[in-house]
């Protein structure tokens, strides 16, 4: 079993320009790839969990989102990306703040929940962490590596 670092996508892994549908629209958050590499070196699963209502809104197709996620997986050490396609008011157990995406990841990976956390940039991310009974770290939308390193070092000391 290994701990998981669950990362929100838009605003944590990439710059949140609204609905990012294509690789040409993608811009990495400063330090995100290095932060992902550091987490992997510490023995974490790195798992992205993201609400993608652009699909339900008709602004992106599921194949577009999956192709973008395949590109991210090919260019980082991220282990998996889970997304929810539903609108905020839809009753979906996967859409954050519900913990469904994290729970599915727990079925797919041997996760040490006692050492896992979720890093996000919105209250719904922190609520999803709370609903999954793990700590939530709120990123200020900039380079989050220091925040995560401090958190991990406090947990291991």
Q: For each predicted feature, which ranges?
A:
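Substrate-recognition element of Asp-dependent hydrolases with the DxDx(T/V) motif
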Residues: 32, 36-69, 78-87, 129
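Conserved protein kinase catalytic core
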Residues: 14-16, 57, 127
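Anionic group-transfer/hydrolysis microenvironments
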Residues: 10, 53, 98
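Active-site neighborhood of HAD-like aspartate-dependent phosphohydrolases
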Residues: 1-47
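Flexible, glycine- and charge-enriched loops at secondary-structure boundaries
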Residues: 22-29, 58-62, 95
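Gly/Ser/Thr-rich helix-start
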Residues: 12, 59, 121
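A short alpha-helix capping/helix-coil boundary motif
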Residues: 12-16, 48-51, 80-82, 103-106
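Asp-based, Mg2+/Mn2+-dependent phosphohydrolase catalytic module
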Residues: 3, 63-80, 89-118, 122-157
């Amino acid at each position: 079993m290994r701990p998981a670092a669950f990362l929100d996508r838009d605003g944590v892994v990439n710059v949140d320009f609204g609905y990012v549908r294509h690789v040409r629209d993608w811009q990495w958050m400063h330090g995100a790839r290095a932060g992902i590499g550091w987490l992997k070196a510490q023995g974490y699963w790195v798992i992205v969990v993201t609400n993608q209502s652009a699909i339900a809104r008709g602004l992106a197709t599921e194949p577009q989102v999956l192709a973008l996620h395949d590109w991210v997986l090919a260019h980082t050490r991220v282990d998996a990306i889970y997304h929810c396609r539903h609108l905020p008011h839809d009753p979906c157990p996967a859409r954050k703040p519900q913990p469904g995406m994290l729970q599915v990841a727990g079925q797919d990976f041997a996760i040490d929940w006692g050492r896992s956390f979720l890093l996000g940039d919105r209250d719904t991310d922190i609520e999803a962490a709370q609903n999954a009974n793990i700590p939530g770290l709120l990123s200020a939308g900039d380079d989050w590596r220091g925040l995560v390193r401090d958190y991990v070092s406090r947990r291991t000391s």
